[in-house]
């Protein structure tokens, strides 16, 4: 990880090149060593925004990128999330802005504090002596705040929803949950209103697929097809190698191999946080019911970051328990590895 600077969020202003500010307000965000899968708020969006910020910083027309998230001061999480500033690369910095209680909050609890975040950002940009050329907000909470700031500052705003409240409500209703239960747990009415506001005010809306545009955004009142841009997520090719002889992480291999009778077999690797939508139980069913797969390959399950299973979000231990029951039912001991990620 690059060095952190907790004492200053200032940087010398420059008139050369674009200044882009990215907002990703919920979850646990840091420059690297992401705790992906720790909870529902700390998932793929974290890596998406950090790698996007880093990639934007490498563009020759970009002078500066600030990734803005929430400052968290809470003994239950790493002290890194309390640092006011963290360097990602030469032109890219992560800034943590305090708003709401100091403790870690799930995204559903952040809505009452977004107006204060807007005030904090106006003060932040004033201290910089420079207003961004573009705001890019990720998820509904950031979209609501960025929409307000875009109107106040008179600058364009790009919105990426990542997931949408209307779609989530339909899925939960289909699972048999009541409207009252859904609203109490997920505050979807507030979220959908924020998404509508973001769609109304955004100059451009980024989706990952055409299906996302046609089957999800199209259900919104402020859906404007001309503003939609489909930009599939990129991939960091430096993470991959064709040198099969290199074993750069022997400790990782050892943690996976210790569960297996024959570690030399090819591996089916699955990485996901324990969530109903990931359909992990069906994966175990398919593997367990296939003698050919079991003969030819091992199965490895990397199920998100955790320090203590007793402190995980309530649904996650239940999912893990169901997976363990299936592993026992199909007698997969020695063929499946489920190490504790670190």
Predicted features and spans:
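Catalytic cores of nucleotide-sugar-dependent glycosyltransferases that transfer UDP/GDP/TDP-activated
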Residues: 1-342
